Amino acid sequence: MNKQPEEWQDPQSLQQQDDEQDEIIWVSKSEIKRDAETLKQLGVELVSLGKNALEKIPLDDDLRCAIALAQRIKREGQRRQIQLIGKMLRARDPEPIQQALDKLKNRHNQQITLFHKLEILRDKLLAQGDDAIAQVLEHYPQADRQQLRALVRNAQKEKAAKKPPKTARQLYQYLHTLSEAD
């Protein structure tokens, strides 16, 4: 069959041929392997989660069962099961799963940051006394001044007497309830 020179063909057929050539996207084997490894790591993270955390992630029943099985088995069987989970994730859209997992991690990091801030605030209350109480009352106007002063005073007495920090823990819990109410 003789092929016609390009100048003899109509412009629309040339445009269609160019579009078909543009649609072909070559993906290297290394990139495919990297993507597969990323999805396998996502599977490892899913297997390491607890039951309550897994309920918050949008998974279908097959994937949920595969993850539950991977959590029950050990060593080589678990490795193979994680590879299967990675393969199952390749057939699905992993983006919503990754977003839910990131949201869970972020919430955990926010809680840790809050705990550290409250511990610093408690230590500041024990060190500075009334000045720090005034700052806490500005930040948390719903706080009970008398209860806060009593907790600080008792925690300072315990610290001076080298007793276990029972009241300091109560002060921390009180600050935690204030931050939750805020």
From Swiss-Prot:
GO biological processes: assembly of large subunit precursor of preribosome
Residue stretches in coiled coil: none
Keywords: Cytoplasm, Ribosome biogenesis, RNA-binding, rRNA-binding
One GO MF term attached to the UniProt entry: rRNA binding
Major location (coarse): cytoplasm
Top-rank taxon: Bacteria
Keyword Calcium carried by entry: no
Pfam families in the record: DarP (PF04751)
Region spans: Disordered: 1-20
HAMAP family named in the record: DarP
Function: Member of a network of 50S ribosomal subunit biogenesis factors which assembles along the 30S-50S interface, preventing incorrect 23S rRNA structures from forming. Promotes peptidyl transferase center (PTC) maturation.
NCBIfam families, alphabetized: PRK05255.1-1
Protein name in UniProt: Dual-action ribosomal maturation protein DarP
Taxon lineage: Bacteria, Pseudomonadati, Pseudomonadota, Gammaproteobacteria, Enterobacterales
The gene coding this protein: darP
